[in-house]
Amino acid sequence: MSKQKVVVGMSGGVDSSVTAWLLKEQGYDVVGLFMKNWEDDDDSEYCSTRQDWIDVVSVADLIGIDVEAVNFAAEYKDRVFAEFLREYSAGRTPNPDVLCNAEIKFKAFLDHAMSLGAQTIATGHYARVRENNGRFELLKALDHTKDQSYFLHRLNQAQLSKTLFPLGEIPKTRVREIAEQIALPNAKKKDSTGICFIGERPFRDFLNRYLPTKPGPMKTTEGKVVGEHIGLAFYTFGQRKGIGLGGSKDGSGEPWFVAGKDIPSNTLYVAQGHDHPWLLSHTLSAGNTSWVAGEPPADGFACGAKTRYRQADAPCTFSSAGAGEGLFELNFDVAQWAVTPGQSAVLYDGDVCLGGGIIEHAVTGQPATRQPQKAALLTAR
């Protein structure tokens, strides 16, 4: 009987390398595929593509598998990066890794793998897939400290049915041990962090290459002008560093945080203190939804939710009634800090990831007289 063919997305990192080795050991016919998703900085000090490809080839030679490279840069720019810029231009803070998984790694890559005759694909993500009564569920990794289901919540039944996540069953420490034991050439390579196409470069410098500055007033939540911002796109809700008010003696003396943006007037609002009312939200609304099972939870469903990666699940209640077409609301038991439009609100039932949506608006503790201004900003597209 022929072996089942699986195409593994290999990045040159330890996780995807160990994934390929584990599947080879389990008897799969493994083929490695290196995805090149960005071309603008091939000669930049921040671009590691060449070294990553060298590492992929070295690992493939060691474990005895074929490997090829495929260029998805055009698809990435059209499906992911263009949306990234649109969202920042609208004053929101997107998460391109979520969109990259749904559109590139589990769509363009999956389609390419199927064209090679593969039955399944695999990646080095820390998550799990389980079949339950004919439906496929996306679960958190057993190692919750490394769980990446938040970034995978937009995957659908067709994608999950053809996906393997071997690392979801083992802790990260064991992955590193395996890499050392089998003498992977990249065993000591550091994990990648941050947005893939930005790398280690200063984020504001990168964004300024594509979006112009647009200075405007920086005001306190009481309306007092305390400075000038360089453009709303260059700030995110809850931001503390890089505001330019570190030495300000105004107010309470506590640190300043970005507390809001008003798009029509090009105003950036700042507040003092981590727990300022403008930074706390009991309720959010989200749109552009995607549900793993193909349908949303029932109204009134009690679940947990993350509004950012590495956040503990926050108890809340789900509702779609009255939220607007294609929208849902979450009402949290405890106020959440810096719920940011453009980020993903992802729902969980224990370890099962249900899906989620893109945050449109969060109701904060600011005075009611200012709520319309805040709402206009947060729902601006």
Swiss-Prot record:
**SS bond partners:** 100-196
Annotated stretches, region: Interaction with target base in tRNA = 95-97
Gene3D superfamilies cross-referenced by the UniProt entry: Adenine nucleotide alpha hydrolases-like domains, HUPs, Translation factors
Catalytic class of the enzyme: transferase
| Site features described as Interaction with tRNA, chain residue numbers | 125, 343
Report a single Gene Ontology molecular function.
Answer: tRNA-uridine 2-sulfurtransferase activity
Gene Ontology BP terms: tRNA wobble position uridine thiolation
CDD domains in the cross-refs = MnmA_TRMU-like
Where in the cell? Cytoplasm
Swiss-Prot/TrEMBL catalytic activity: S-sulfanyl-L-cysteinyl-[protein] + uridine(34) in tRNA + AH2 + ATP = 2-thiouridine(34) in tRNA + L-cysteinyl-[protein] + A + AMP + diphosphate + H(+)
Could you say which EC number(s) this protein's record lists? 2.8.1.13
Tell me, what does this protein do in biology?
Catalyzes the 2-thiolation of uridine at the wobble position (U34) of tRNA, leading to the formation of s(2)U34.
Record's protein name: tRNA-specific 2-thiouridylase MnmA
Species of provenance: Paraburkholderia xenovorans (strain LB400)
Upper taxonomic lineage:
Bacteria, Pseudomonadati, Pseudomonadota, Betaproteobacteria, Burkholderiales
